[in-house]
Amino acid sequence: MSNINFIPEIPLTWLTCPIYAEGVLLPKRNESSPDRYSDGKVPFGRAWKEELTVNDSALMIEREPDKFKAIGVFTGQKSDGLVIFDVDRNLGVIEKKWGKDLKKAPKVTSLRKNAAKFLFKVPQDLVTEVASISQTAAGQEGWEVLWGGQGVIAVSYTHLTLPTKA
């Protein structure tokens, strides 16, 4: 049995995916596909089509602890309007620029310096107006917006911090 205590409370309206552990040989797409190994961020492939709740993903992680070491959440309409503001560098500058808004959001931190994810919910009447923004489109400022994809939110080196109520 594994220790799945690293999984935070995740709303049941969010769809999730177990994440392959770093170094795990990934399933082949077809017979002629070359071997590929996980970098620790690769979601369980069938999760893109299946609707896995946090309980489903936790059970998979518990049953195969050497294969899956993290949990991700899908963003966009399939997770009730969840959007992730993903900061890979320049966290201090970004928090200074948008600190007031970021302080209100749940925050996923990691041991990587200057990196965090901030989680927001888009109102239902605005979900058709949201799109992902890549690092390139963001002017290489160190952030991107995840919408319609997935983001890893909990592994042994990350944790989710909920904002304090003012």
Segments and roles (model prediction):
Residues 1-160:
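Conserved phosphate/metal-binding and DNA-contacting active-site motifs used
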Residues 161-166:
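A short, hydrophobic C-terminal helix/tail in secreted or cell-surface proteins
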